[in-house]
A protein has these predicted regions:
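Hydrophobic alpha-helical segments, especially transmembrane helices
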Residues: 9-10, 27, 42, 86, ...
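A conditional alpha-helix N-cap/helix-loop micro-motif detector
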Residues: 46, 77, 106-107, 130, ...
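Hydrophobic faces of well-ordered beta-strands that scaffold small-molecule active sites
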Residues: 36-41, 65-67, 95-100, 125-127, ...
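Active-site beta-loop-alpha junctions enriched in small/polar residues
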Residues: 41-45, 68-72, 100-103, 130, ...
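A short alpha-helix capping/helix-coil boundary motif
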Residues: 31-34, 61-66, 90-95, 115-118, ...
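Histidine-acidic metal/acid-base catalytic patches
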Residues: 2-37, 46-60, 162, 166-180, ...
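Glycine-rich, proline-tolerant flexible connector loops at the mouths of alpha/beta enzymes
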Residues: 66-83
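Active-site acidic/histidine proton-transfer and metal-coordination neighborhood
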Residues: 15, 51-54, 87, 91-177, ...
């Protein structure tokens, strides 16, 4: 064998080994899949009948939906609940949360809502609880092992700032926490990533929503086109350990009669951010 051939073989072997090592390094450095599942608050699709709304959710490539009461009313009709669960199963969808629901000091009415949630497979109830409802809720979240997540609604709402939510829940059962509507927190002048960090350990739902201005009266926009730093939000959610079965829902309230193109943009932005987190 000539010296040149031997040298070439030695070079090729070394190159192959180097390539193999590089490939292994890339595999080792690859990020594990994020424990976050993107879904949609079906209020975004309120302009459609429920079957069509679910079809749109599936077409958007989503696998979980958050119902609002207008599309899945609270009921003790077992057949109606089974029928809705079948609609979801037929489309490969699961239900992440239900809300926004009000709780009062009427313990029987609160129990009815929890019984509905249990039958429907709801793990998180997004809620606007009256202050005198918490004694009842402490008992119900233990009995049913279902979370209650306070939903903020902006500057005129009783749960305006993140500290308002935290103050309401911190002395109660750990399963009582927050559904942070990041758009409404923007309207309240709060930065979404700071809200997420403040609510760490009590954060069970997120509404991915964006507004043009950090003020009460403003316009909803495509995710990332206002004050919502979507990649930073995803990174913050991972950092605080947002639960794998939490409700991470896109909510887009503009153009209810024809929102699909806008929702496609929102989904693309959110997915890209998830891939970067």
């Amino acid at each position: 064998m000539s010296q040149s051939v031997a040298s070439r073989r030695t070079f090729l072997a070394a190159s192959a080994a180097a390539c193999g090592s590089a490939a292994l390094a890339r595999v080792a450095a690859a990020k594990p899949p994020l424990p976050l599942t993107l879904g949609i608050q079906l209020y975004s699709l309120r302009g459609f009948p429920v079957d069509q709304a679910l079809d749109h959710a599936k077409a958007l490539g989503l696998t979980q939906v958050e119902f609002y009461p207008g599309m899945f009313p609270i009921t003790d009709d077992a057949a109606a609940i089974v029928a809705m669960k079948q609609k979801l199963a037929d489309r490969g969808l699961t239900i992440s949360a239900h809300g926004v629901n009000r709780f009062t000091n009427d313990a029987a009415a609160n129990r009815k809502l929890f019984a509905f949630a249990k039958a429907a497979g709801v793990k998180t109830i997004a809620a606007d609880p009256d202050p005198d409802s918490f004694a009842s809720l402490d008992e119900l979240v233990k009995e049913f092992d279902i979370r209650v997540a306070i939903h903020n609604h902006g500057p005129t709402h009783r749960y305006n700032k993140a500290l308002d939510v935290l103050g309401a829940v911190e002395k109660h059962d750990q399963r009582i926490g927050a559904c942070a509507d990041l758009g409404h927190f923007i309207r309240s002048g709060e930065r979404p990533t700071e809200v997420i960090r403040l609510l760490e350990g009590r954060l069970y739902g997120i509404h991915l929503k964006d507004f043009a201005e950090m003020q009460d009266k403003t316009k909803g926009v495509i995710l990332g086109q206002g004050h919502l730093d979507v990649p930073a939000v995803m990174e913050a959610l991972v950092a605080v350990g947002f639960p794998a079965d939490g409700a991470l829902s896109i909510e887009y309230e503009e153009n209810p009669k024809d929102p699909i193109a806008d929702l496609e943009e929102c989904v693309a932005v959110a997915r890209q951010a998830l891939n970067q987190a």
